[in-house]
Amino acid sequence: MEPSISGHAPAPARIRSAGHWLRRELLPVLALLLLLGTARASFANHYHVPSGSMQPTLQPGDRVAVDMSAYGVRVPFTRHVLIERGRPQRGDVVVFDSPADGTRLIKRVVAVAGDRVELRDGHLSINGVPMADAADPQAERFGPRVARLDLANGGGPDILDARVPAGHVLVLGDHRGRSVDGRWFGFVPVDALYARALAVYWRSGDGLGWRRL
């Protein structure tokens, strides 16, 4: 009697075939997802603005594109810098971890290491030079950048005289009277800066766009 011939491959062959399919089809997809996740954690991301502390520059609910490699390429999900790049500059809008409780915030760098800072009635002076824009007292000029201020609720606490220590920056909100910022939690270590904000890419009522910061 001749053995019967089944139309199905033997079980070991089916297992080998399934394993080959997984390696050929699934592993590249997993590798791509891992690559995208790593890129998101190390290079580009977005931030959802939770409050009005940066008005009028940023509105509550704004979606902001950020460059996570602006100050260095890090090991994903850590503060360890693999490749150093730029240093924070006055006027940069940055996302960082609060020294007080680790909450992720977005504010403006107004002073860097070595700067002497005074803030009176919401108006900033760096190294004895007022930052107010000559054409608009409700704005401050940081080189080519102009930051619009909201002083409708006053300027908040003053800074009478302070010097930024090495490896740190001072951050303030553009809405000076309603911002919990460096006046409350002190100077921010540079390695706590998570990203530099590039642009608002979505705003309620306006929809998609690219409003550069």
What name fits each language-model region?
Residues 29-39:
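Single-pass alpha-helical transmembrane signal-anchor segments
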Residues 2-25, 38, 42-213:
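Soluble "head" domains of membrane/secretory-pathway proteins
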